[in-house]
Amino acid sequence: MTFSLDALARQLRDAEQSGQAIAPLRDILGVDNADAAYAIQRLNVQHHVAHGRRVVGRKVGLTHPKVQQQLGVNQPDFGTLFADMCYGDNAEVPFGRVLQPKVEAEIALVLKQDLPHADTTFDELYNAIEWVLPALEVVGSRIRDWSIGFVDTVADNASCGLYVIGGPAQRPAGLDLKQCAMHMTRNQELVSSGRGSECLGHPLNAAVWLARKLASLGEPLRAGDIVLTGALGPMVTINEGDSFVAHIEGIGSVAARFVAAGEGDRDA
């Protein structure tokens, strides 16, 4: 089957703009065609940059073993973070900003050094971290009914929608990122829990994978980049009016409320 990567990239952009999700791409691309899926993601990143959006980092997705098993994959994926996706702690986020939104609690990193090597080690990654922060990632899918396989989510910018950064910002020394417990509430009811070890065994393992992958592609992580390392527990569906608070033991907390269109304010 022949297909146009540009046309498929445009379909995803149109879905985001119109709020109308599209059919899965895997039947067109082939279920194992990761190269084409990343090419579509790259085309859309290039389009957005050309139209004034600013890249500020990357996210790692598919870090939880149960999610990998569900999609039949044995590796994470990555997506691109833009400045206009970022909200501050306790933000009021327009509910309609992300299609079919769900939320995850994660650990975010801010880097102080470039990571140009495809064999980046755990220690090199650790020493490149300036700040560790709690975060919420709002994932969404431009694919109808979240009917996604690996290539669907990769092409769709790893299902990234927006992210909320909490506090405090801390140096990594002394933090137990592996064993830290996470609890997230929706409207004061516990809806998700987990710990750092559920993210590829350690959140920094996810960051090491990302650093190696991007360096091998000639697009290495740079000083100043934000990295979302992946979910610490199950993702949860968002409904209009919901308030979420995530506490990550020893790391901090982050909160957001999802409001009707026109009410929210972005803190980019």
Curated annotation (Swiss-Prot):
SUPFAM superfamilies: FAH. It catalyses: (S)-4-hydroxy-2-oxopentanoate = (2Z)-2-hydroxypenta-2,4-dienoate + H2O. GO terms for biological process: 3-phenylpropionate catabolic process. One of its GO terms (molecular function) is manganese ion binding. Pfam families: FAA_hydrolase. Pathway: Aromatic compound metabolism; 3-phenylpropanoate degradation. Keywords: Aromatic hydrocarbons catabolism, Lyase. Its EC number is 4.2.1.80. Its cofactor is a divalent metal cation. GO terms for cellular component: cytoplasm. InterPro entries: Fumarylacetoacetase-like_C, Fumarylacetoacetase_C_sf, Hydratase-Decarb/MhpD_sf, Keto_pentenoate-hydratase. Belongs to the hydratase/decarboxylase family. MhpD subfamily. Catalyzes the conversion of 2-hydroxypentadienoic acid (enolic form of 2-oxopent-4-enoate) to 4-hydroxy-2-ketopentanoic acid. This is 2-keto-4-pentenoate hydratase. It comes from Klebsiella pneumoniae subsp. pneumoniae (strain ATCC 700721 / MGH 78578).
